[in-house]
Regions:
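Non-catalytic terminal and connector segments of soluble metabolic enzymes
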Residues: 1-121
Length: 121
């Protein structure tokens, strides 16, 4: 399944999503930053989707991210590193359930499944 939508994050969403950070001194400012504007939530699927998306995103610290990744090219610092990516399939499933309703996700036959995979390419 796949999906995409604009989301206005609120305190409850962020407290749940970043529950492992609530006691950190930067958490309040992180929440304030993330609630300033809507964010784009995207659900992707595919072979090794979590690992492939994480390659595109880059290291959490933009200074350590490889050139050409989203964080290296577009982020300034760790607290505002521009993008979140799930670290595992299990985490992704929890995050999808947190931010998307079932009717906001779509299942369809991809062209790659129809043509490339049948040919063994």
């Amino acid at each position: 399944f796949v999906g995409m939508k604009l989301i206005r994050l609120d305190d409850a969403m962020l407290d749940e999503h970043y529950s492992h950070l609530v006691d950190k001194p930067f958490f309040v400012s992180l929440k304030q930053f993330m609630m300033q504007t809507p964010v784009v939530g995207i659900v992707l699927e595919g072979y090794e989707a979590v690992a492939e998306v994480r390659k595109l995103v880059g290291s959490t610290n933009p200074r350590e991210a490889d050139a050409g990744t989203i964080r290296a090219d577009l982020s300034i610092n760790v607290p505002s590193n521009l993008i979140h990516a799930s670290d595992s399939v299990e985490t992704a499933m929890n995050e999808i359930a947190r931010f998307f309703n079932e009717d906001e996700l779509f299942v369809y036959e991809k062209l790659t499944d129809r043509y490339h995979l049948r040919e063994g390419v």
